[in-house]
A protein has these predicted regions:
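A metal-dependent hydrolase signature that marks the N-terminal structural subdomain at the beginning
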Residues: 1-90, 98-108
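Amphipathic alpha-helical segments that form well-ordered structural scaffolds
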Residues: 26-33, 119-122, 145-149
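Acidic carboxylate-rich catalytic motifs and surrounding loops in phosphoryl-/glycosyl-chemistry enzymes
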Residues: 49, 131-133
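Pocket-edge structural micro-motifs
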Residues: 93
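Short pre-active-site segment immediately N-terminal to the catalytic Zn-binding motif
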Residues: 96-118, 133-134
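Post-HExxH zinc-binding segment in Zn-dependent metallohydrolases
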Residues: 135-151
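Active-site recognition of the HExxH zinc-binding catalytic motif
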Residues: 117-130, 142
Length: 151
């Protein structure tokens, strides 16, 4: 990251949950690998669990590949800039690590890959919206950028 473009802040907001991995340091290290131009406009990355949201938020739906998906089942969300509120990325740590054995999560390389898949996919949504708009399906573009950033 260059000095004139600050890196997005990483915030941990959990309710009745302790992540089994050092999610803050993992995400901070992954963000350091993303070229600064792609993160311009992203204010923060919020690490949270699904219980942290209120009932209304947990019941919300989002669109993915022309289908409605419950937010409570998502691993991450990208919130674009809107009415003066800067863009942000929300990662649901409990959903990211759900179903993965603890001994696998303790291997740093694998833990980084698991978080990189979700984080870079959401950064891909930001790139698609703010930097390189394309007339293709949103999830496909986000997957493309996610894979490109993981290399």
């Amino acid at each position: 990251m260059s000095l004139n473009q600050p890196q997005p802040t990483v915030q941990e907001i959990f309710k009745n949950y302790t992540p089994p991995v050092p999610a803050y340091s993992v995400v901070t290290n992954l963000l350091a690998e993303v070229p600064a131009i792609y993160l311009t406009g992203v204010d923060s990355v919020i690490l949270t669990n699904i219980e942290c949201g209120n009932r209304k938020k947990r019941r919300q739906k989002t669109l993915s590949r022309k289908r409605k998906v419950a937010v409570k089942d998502c691993r991450g969300l990208y919130h674009q800039q809107w009415q003066g509120i800067p863009a942000r990325i929300e990662l649901f740590v409990d959903n990211i690590v759900n179903g993965i054995p603890l001994w696998i999560l303790r291997i740093p390389l694998i833990c980084n890959l698991i978080f990189a898949e979700v984080l870079f996919h959401e950064v891909g949504h930001h790139i698609h919206y703010a930097k390189v708009p394309e007339h293709r399906e949103r999830e496909g573009v986000a997957n493309y950028w996610g894979k490109k950033l993981r290399k």
